[in-house]
Amino acid sequence: LHAEESIELLETIPINKTLFGKTTIESIVDRGAGKGSFIYTKKVLSSKEDGKPLAIVYSNTLARADGGWAKTDSFKKKPTLIQTSNPPVGEPDIIDNIETLPQAALLYRLCGDMNPLHADPVIAKKAGFNSPILHGRCTMGIAMRSLITKCCDFDATRLAQISVRFSSP
């Protein structure tokens, strides 16, 4: 289950070049028996031509029901992927309502995330949702688009980093 994602954009990502990503596991945290484990990864996205890093993607994945394996406390210290703070007080600075297609989760699924939670109504209901839900990364992409249009005057190069935590609606 995708828990957190942070993207740091080092350069403008070219649309006409071949890219590659190298992923490393940064940490695995045992949350305890029946609570699962967090798997923290770092992916460096680079140009295949010259190897120049273009972006760094940090992810936190929850392996549900895979906890209780650590024999020492060294696997129980959680790194900080996303700095938390108190929610802001008052009205939001900007509200952007973006309508998505009813089949958006099925289209995004073509990226390779075949979790049935995003496609199968029966599985979604068993998980406590009324219907299949949109992927977290797809929602993140929609939020990024909104930030670029509303806060960056349509200039994607002005967005240097975004971090999100995926939680229940």
Model regions: which residues?
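Catalytic strand-loop segment that frames the active site of acyl-thioester-processing enzymes
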Residues: 61-134, 148
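Active-site helix/loop of acyl-thioester processing domains in fatty-acid/polyketide metabolism
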Residues: 1, 5-10, 48-49, 107, ...
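A general, composition-driven signal for non-globular sequence regions
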Residues: 21, 36-37, 129-131, 139
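HotDog/MaoC-like acyl-thioester-processing domains
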Residues: 4-96, 161, 166-169
